[in-house]
Amino acid sequence: MRCKMKFIVFEGLDGSGKSSLMAALERELQNRAINFLRTREPGGTPLGDEIRNMILRKEGPAPTPRTELLLYEASRSQHVDQVIRPALAAGTWVLCDRFAASSVAFQSGGRAISEADVVMLNTFATGGLKADITVLLDLSVEESRRRRQGRGAVTGETEDRIESEADTFHENVRQSFLKQSREDAAAWIVLDARETPEVLFKQLLQSLTERKVL
């Protein structure tokens, strides 16, 4: 049923255009009078935002890979319980910037933690909740870095601890996203993030229509 609430997640390297594409989909949902909630991970709740700052800040001691994973999962558990599940139960669509696939990509792909362990913790933190559709904006590491640097030159913002990781880390993250998309192709939409925002939205809308989401 096309009007049923949907949980749509946007994934990709930093600078891939997730925010712009989410904003375009928001406008489409508004035009169709579909109630929606936009949120993000890590964060999405007051406690989650505190955890986000702990993970991403450069100041102070960095968490070990396992600690980092557990912090992400703690934020996710709070987010699912307090925000995502209540919204879905109320019939509201949820658009989320990153979710469980990011933990597989960053903590397993990037940090080399066992994928089985990450998946197990994802399942525990979410209570088994999965995205209906995951939209992957695929972008090369080089282009991701170029866009991040360009953004920083305009805003004056510096890169966070994760963004500052080496290119090899980000390439492993990218390849993990692509691997996940191949293994669950029916639930993933992969877009070439080099395209213009207009083309990307047109492709997304077409894919959502073909899958009877919209």
From Swiss-Prot:
Its EC number is 2.7.4.9. InterPro entries: P-loop_NTPase, Thymidylate_kin-like_dom, Thymidylate_kin_CS, Thymidylate_kinase. It catalyses: dTMP + ATP = dTDP + ADP. ATP binds at G12, L13, D14, G15, S16, G17, K18, S19. Keywords: ATP-binding, Kinase, Nucleotide biosynthesis, Nucleotide-binding, Transferase. CDD domains: TMPK. GO terms for biological process: dTDP biosynthetic process; dTTP biosynthetic process; dUDP biosynthetic process. Belongs to the thymidylate kinase family. Phosphorylation of dTMP to form dTDP in both de novo and salvage pathways of dTTP synthesis. PANTHER family: THYMIDYLATE KINASE, UMP-CMP KINASE 2, MITOCHONDRIAL. This is Thymidylate kinase. It comes from Bdellovibrio bacteriovorus (strain ATCC 15356 / DSM 50701 / NCIMB 9529 / HD100).
